[in-house]
Amino acid sequence: LFKVFPDVIAVELPNNVQEEVLEAIERLPFLSLIGYADTLSPKRMNFIPIDPGDSIIESIRIGLEHNIPIELIDLSVPEYLPPSFKLPDDYAINQIGLHMFYQKISEYFKKENKDKEAKLRNKVNLKDFLKNQEKIEKEYDSTEKDILREKYMAAHLLKLMSIYHRVLLIIGMAHWENVKYYMENPERIEDEDLELIPHKYVKIYNIKGSDARFILRELPYHTYRWLKFREKFSKEKLESIETPEELYTNLNSYNKIEQIRKILIKAKYDYEEEFKEFVDLHKLKTLFQYSRNLSLADQRLLPNLFHLLISSKNIVDDDYAWKVMEKATKYPYDDESDNYETLKMSLEGAYDPSGRYIKLRRHHPYIYGKEKEVPLKEKPEEKYPGEWKDKWKEGKDYTVSWPPEDILEEDYFAFIRKKTIKNLKNQRIKIEEFKSS
């Protein structure tokens, strides 16, 4: 974006939810989810998560901060269930660059859809779809719906190019080749009014920080650290930077690997303080290596939450894994006002304030995979702050305990436990005499 300094930013989002998208982005860092449907009381909704770590949301946010016009150019297609792709870890872009990354994954797109898309490119009629938006009689499969969207986006871009000199397009890589094809062959696009009818149901929902991991693509801790990082680069700060090299050095200084290290280190300090167990440097080194190997085995460059928890559990214990879970999934921003209804999120869907379950479908495809079950012992939680203290007070007359003595006994038991483990380890040491041949 800072290389182009565009006159307008065009993004791959439906243009009949533009007002809601801009309003939700203005709420950041509070999280929002925009749900929309074609019935007034939907049981299923398409949704757009306002994810601060998403490139589309970030580009809109930068545009708003720098007074650059924003255009949402995508077509809203009913009952759209896009095919999902398990793309390579996008951390690779930091190492090989965006151009090489796109070249590599575009080979997969061509292999999967080339023949079918080539047959349908000139058969799917956008004009018929736009004329019959309220009552669409023809059924379209996912490939046909994608071609409708790509035609619509190309038509929208051609109109923008007649108005603006520099147009910055933020779009999914899977769509770029077809959008480019229609822009190079405008005669393939039917001449039609590009206005979309409004959805019957569009609503901005508030999402609590505790549910952040269900809508964010990154670990919530990563997203939080990114928000803190971007605070350092206000409009005035960016304008004071004198050379492009200085700008790119600053922008590229955010390091996800360093944030993963901080998650594990902060969890270590909390664990040691609460459980009085020491996690030594050798264990930490093994933990870093183990989580890295797990991620590589899953064909990822950086570990995800599952990898971090499995590593923590196996190298230290369940209690430490819970500390890692708390640090990795913590998103500290919560909107305490009642300006927006709050959805209670889960992996499969959401519950509105009345308790009604709503099935959610993401506007952009994204593979979560089913949440792998992490074999952690369930951690008890208070139903309300101070519950356990109240329960203790209720039964204090029947409890024989004296805290100074308890502390001495617990420390002694901890000492015996560690001493026993050390002795058992020593018994397993075997020394062989070195003999030369």
Predicted regions and their residues:
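Compositional signal for N-terminal targeting/processing segments
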Residues: L1-S437
